[in-house]
């Protein structure tokens, strides 16, 4: 089971936040995450793994402040120790930075690049945020592997279409270039013929 929440920015952009029911489900979330996903976890404490799905083309720096705080409050609320504390640090990083090796326990992860891990602090629990998120909560049983394949297939099709469009434009540019070269060549030929014609006319005048 995966829990889904909806968060909105001040400019009305909506984002999906999701988390697994337990550490075993977290394994699938780690395995089938998307490049657009940002992972959240309470720093140095046990907590849920919360993911934020960005819009295509967005980066971690583009996360709206209010959406970032929604994610941080949600992950803090789902930490047995963290939910009782103030000034809790929450780490977050792109899904692609998560490292999972065979010797790690279930639900445990590391990072490929520590420099890509950011921290946000939740000073204290804000019920208004949690209540708002709770109203959007949905429980689903998604086929994560199929969803990931569908996303990757769509990306491949988009790239294929972009390549085809690029080739079409290149072909069109080459055609225009050939036409311009032919036009310049024809213009040069006409100039030469005109010069020859004028030269012939001058010769005739001299003989007269």
Swiss-Prot record:
GO terms for cellular component: endomembrane system; plasma membrane. Belongs to the CCDC25 family. Keywords: Acetylation, Cell membrane, Coiled coil, DNA-binding, Membrane, Phosphoprotein, Transmembrane, Transmembrane helix. Residues 144-184 have a biased composition (Basic and acidic residues). Disruption phenotype: In the context of cancer, mice display reduced metastase formation, without affecting primary tumor growth. PANTHER family: COILED-COIL DOMAIN-CONTAINING PROTEIN 25, DUF814-RELATED. The modification Phosphoserine is found at residue 204. Pfam families: NFACT-R_1 (PF05670). It is found in: Cell membrane; Endomembrane system. Residues 21-25 are annotated as: DNA-binding. This is Coiled-coil domain-containing protein 25. It comes from Mus musculus (Mouse). Transmembrane receptor that senses neutrophil extracellular traps (NETs) and triggers the ILK-PARVB pathway to enhance cell motility. NETs are mainly composed of DNA fibers and are released by neutrophils to bind pathogens during inflammation. Formation of NETs is also associated with cancer metastasis, NET-DNA acting as a chemotactic factor to attract cancer cells. GO terms for molecular function: DNA binding. GO terms for biological process: positive regulation of cell motility. Its main location: membrane. Disulfide bonds: none annotated. Residues 1-105 are extracellular. Residues 117-187 form a coiled coil. The chain crosses the membrane at residues 106-122.
């Amino acid at each position: 089971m995966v829990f889904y929440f909806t968060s909105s920015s001040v400019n009305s952009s909506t984002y999906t936040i999701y988390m697994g029911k337990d550490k075993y489900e977290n394994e699938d979330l780690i395995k089938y995450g998307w490049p657009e996903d940002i992972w959240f976890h309470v720093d140095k404490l046990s907590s849920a793994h919360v993911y934020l799905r960005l819009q295509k083309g967005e980066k971690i720096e583009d996360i709206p402040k209010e959406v970032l705080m929604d994610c941080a409050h949600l992950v803090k609320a789902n930490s047995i120790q963290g939910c009782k504390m103030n000034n809790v640090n929450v780490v977050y990083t792109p899904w692609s930075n998560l490292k999972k090796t065979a010797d790690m326990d279930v639900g445990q992860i590391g990072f490929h690049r520590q420099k890509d891990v950011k921290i946000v602090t939740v000073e204290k629990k804000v019920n208004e945020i949690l209540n708002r998120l709770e109203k959007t909560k949905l429980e689903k049983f998604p086929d994560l592997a199929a969803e990931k394949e569908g996303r990757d297939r769509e990306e491949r099709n988009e790239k294929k279409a972009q390549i085809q469009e690029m080739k079409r434009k290149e072909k069109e540019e080459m055609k225009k270039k050939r036409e311009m070269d032919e036009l310049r060549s024809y213009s040069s030929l006409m100039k030469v013929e005109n010069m020859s014609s004028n030269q012939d006319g001058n010769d005739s005048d001299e003989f007269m």
